[in-house]
Amino acid sequence: MKDNISEEEVRKFNKLAEEWWNPDGSFAALHTLNPLRFNYIKNWAEINKKKCLDIGCGGGILTESLSKYADHVDGLDMANKAISVAKNHQELMGIKNITYHNSNLEKFVEINHEQYDVLTCMEMLEHVPSPEQIIESCSKALIGGGHLFISTINRNIKSYLMAIIGAEYILKLLPQGTHEFDSFLKPSEIEQWSRKSGLNLIDLTGVMYNPITKTFKLTDNVSVNYMMHFRKE
């Protein structure tokens, strides 16, 4: 199987690694978004004392939130500098139930043969060459009845204007060049791939940003940012 890795994306996020835990830095939007996405996960899945895998964990923002409830969390990312930052912050916070891995998902699943109650794949699918391959591996890593949570960006004119022009160039919520329009994904594409891998769609919810209040909220509008919840058969 060909490595499902974009070296350009890895370099991009390695350059930003020291910014991960700066709430006013390049990942400020993720710090603002994190409580919303974490509560979404908690509302749909029981994570207390469960085993979780955070795919594309970066510096560990969501990983640490999951660790407050889960029995154990594995965090996975291809950006080695982001993993170093995540490990350092884990040590600083005295967290014992996280293990970070500098690996891609496919190799991790092949080597570890572990199965998880909850998988999170947030703001990650749009950064790999084959998102379908990621979803297939997610299914392999889940127990029967396990939960998969995905968040990404829709592909249409509105999402280009808002997620790239607006977020990166006008509001400067993200560094310029964070996203490529051609890598955005329609919910129907993700659902089709997931169904092929034995994952059933439970929920599809939009995420909207208010530039005046600088807050995120859930919405029925999935035209730009959205989250999906799947369960394995």
Language-model segments: residues:
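Conserved class I S-adenosyl-L-methionine
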Residues: 50-56, 149-171
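Conserved alpha-helix/loop element of class I SAM-dependent methyltransferases that forms part
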Residues: 31-50
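N-terminal, positively charged/glycine-rich alpha-helical extensions of SAM-dependent methyltransferases
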Residues: 1-21
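A conserved beta-strand element that flanks and buttresses the S-adenosyl-L-methionine
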Residues: 120
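Acceptor-substrate binding/catalytic loop of class I
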Residues: 172-189
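Class I SAM-dependent methyltransferase SAM/SAH-binding core
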Residues: 61-107
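A short glycine-rich, Lys/Arg-flanked "PGG" loop and its adjoining helix->strand segment in the class I
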Residues: 132-144
